[in-house]
Regions:
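Hydrophobic alpha-helical bundle signature of multipass membrane enzymes
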Residues: 2-192, 207-210, 214-219, 223, ...
Length: 381
C-alpha cells in the first residue's frame, strides 16, 4: 500500500511540481550503473510516461479521473469497500476476500525491497509525480492487489450469483477486471510506475487471486470446519502465521537496508515526499507491519464473529444501508485516528511506534465484523 495519503494525491493532482527542471540532470550521479534495465526504464519514460501525461493534461478531468482510480485501491478506499461489502451486501464475500489485502501487500513489499527499483519520477524530472510514495517501484502494489481482488471476486460472483448478463450481454463480473485494468493504467499516468511494473504486478495478482479462491480458501474452510469446536486453535494458528510474516518482514527490511543503503539525493529531491526525506525502507516497514496486524485481527475476528447476528444480516432498506455505512465508517475512523494520535504524538521510539501501528491496523477487522454490527443492533439498523 502506498506510503502517502491517497486523498491528498487526488486533491493535489493538478498542482505542478515546484521549481522542477524540465530536462534530466546530466551531472546527477545515478545510484545504479546505466544497465540494460536503466535504459529500458528510460525507454518507457520517453515513450509512455511523457506522452501519456501530456495526453492527460490535454483532456479536461482526465488527470483527476486517473488519480481517483488509483485512490480506490489504497487504504482508505479498501476499508470503505470492505465495510460497505460486509454491512450491506455480503458478509461471506467480505470475510473470504479481505485476506488478500494483507497477504498481497506484504508480499509485494518484500519483492520491492528485493529489486530496489526507483519510481519513474525519482530518476527523471520530466515525469510529473502525481502520486507520492516512499515505496520502490517494481512491481506495482496497486496492480497486484487490484488484479488479485478482481480475480477472486469474479470467480466468487460467477459461482454464487451467476453470469449476471448486462443489457449488452457482457457478464457483469468482467467489470472487476475493467476496474483492475483502470487502476493499473492510472499508475502510469500518475508517474508512479513503469508499464512493466503494472504488467508484472497484474500477472502476479491474477495468479494469487486464482490460487486463493481455488486452493487456499477451500483448505482453510476445511480446516475451520475440522476445528470448529476449538476456536482457540484457529486463532492461535492465524496469529502464528502473522508472527511469521512479521519475522520475515523484519529480516527482509534489514537485508534491504544494508543492500541498498540510503536513497540518493537525486531521488530525494524528485520524489516530492515531505521535506525531501525519502525513506524507501523505514517508512514502508510501518505499512507492512500494519498489514501483519490486519492478518492478526482477521484471525481473531472471523473466528469470534457470528454471521447470523442481526447486525450482519442484510439491511431491509436503502436508508438502513446508508445509515450502516455512515455509522460504521464513523466508528472505524474514530478508533483509527484515536490510535494514530497516540502513535504520532506519544510514541517516542521505533519499537513502540511499530507496536502501535500493528494495533491500529489489527483493530480494523474486529471493528468491521464485531464492533460496527453491535452499533447497528443498538440503534436498530
Amino acid at each position: 500500500m502506498e506510503s502517502s495519503s491517497s486523498l491528498l494525491n487526488v486533491v493535489n493532482h493538478g498542482k505542478k511540481p515546484t521549481s522542477r527542471p524540465r530536462s534530466e540532470s546530466a551531472d546527477a550521479k545515478d545510484r545504479f550503473s546505466f544497465s540494460f534495465l536503466d535504459r529500458f526504464d528510460k525507454f518507457e519514460r520517453d515513450y509512455f510516461h511523457i506522452p501519456m501525461q501530456a495526453l492527460a493534461k490535454s483532456i479536461p478531468g482526465m488527470c483527476t479521473l486517473m488519480t481517483t482510480f488509483g485512490a480506490t485501491c489504497t487504504g482508505e478506499g479498501l476499508v470503505s469497500f470492505f465495510g460497505l461489502l460486509c454491512w450491506t451486501i455480503s458478509v461471506n464475500a467480505c470475510i473470504h476476500g479481505i485476506w488478500l489485502v494483507p497477504v498481497v501487500e506484504v508480499l509485494n513489499g518484500l519483492i520491492k525491497w528485493q529489486f530496489g527499483r526507483p519510481r519513474p519520477g525519482w530518476n527523471d524530472p520530466r515525469v510529473d509525480v502525481l502520486s507520492t510514495s516512499h515505496e520502490y517501484s517494481f512491481p506495482s502494489s496497486h496492480a497486484m492487489l487490484s488484479w488479485s481482488l478482481a480475480t477472486f471476486f469474479a470467480y466468487y460472483w460467477y459461482d454464487n450469483v451467476g453470469t449476471g448478463q448486462t443489457p449488452t450481454s457482457i457478464p457483469i463480473y468482467y467489470a472487476f477486471y475493467c476496474h483492475a485494468a483502470a487502476v493499473s493504467i492510472s499508475r502510469v499516468f500518475d508517474g508512479a510506475h513503469y508499464p512493466k511494473d503494472i504488467i508484472i504486478g497484474g500477472f502476479l495478482g491474477r495468479q494469487i487471486g486464482y490460487a486463493h479462491y481455488h486452493i487456499t480458501l477451500p483448505y482453510f474452510k476445511a480446516y475451520a470446519k475440522l476445528n470448529s469446536t476449538q476456536p482457540m486453535m484457529q486463532i492461535m494458528s492465524g496469529n502464528l502465521i502473522s508472527v511469521a510474516m512479521l519475522v520475515v518482514t523484519l529480516i527482509c527490511y534489514t537485508i534491504a537496508k544494508r543492500r541498498w543503503g540510503k536513497a540518493p539525493k537525486k531521488w530525494c529531491l524528485l520524489a516530492c515526499v515531505k521535506q525531501d526525506n525519502l525513506q524507501p525502507h523505514f517508512v514502508p516497514l510501518f505499512d507492512y507491519v500494519g498489514m501483519c496486524g490486519v492478518f492478526s485481527g482477521l484471525s481473531v475476528a472471523e473466528v469470534v464473529m457470528n454471521s447470523t447476528r442481526p447486525g450482519l444480516l442484510l439491511p431491509t432498506s436503502w436508508l438502513d444501508s446508508l445509515l450502516r455505512i455512515v455509522v460504521g465508517l464513523l466508528v472505524l475512523i474514530g478508533m483509527w485516528f484515536a490510535v494514530r494520535a497516540i502513535e504520532k504524538g506519544m510514541a517516542t521510539n521505533t519499537v513502540t511506534r511499530l507496536l502501535l501501528r500493528f494495533i491500529r491496523y489489527a483493530q480494523v477487522p474486529p471493528i468491521i465484523l464485531l464492533v460496527a454490527p453491535a452499533c447497528f443492533e443498538a440503534i436498530g439498523i
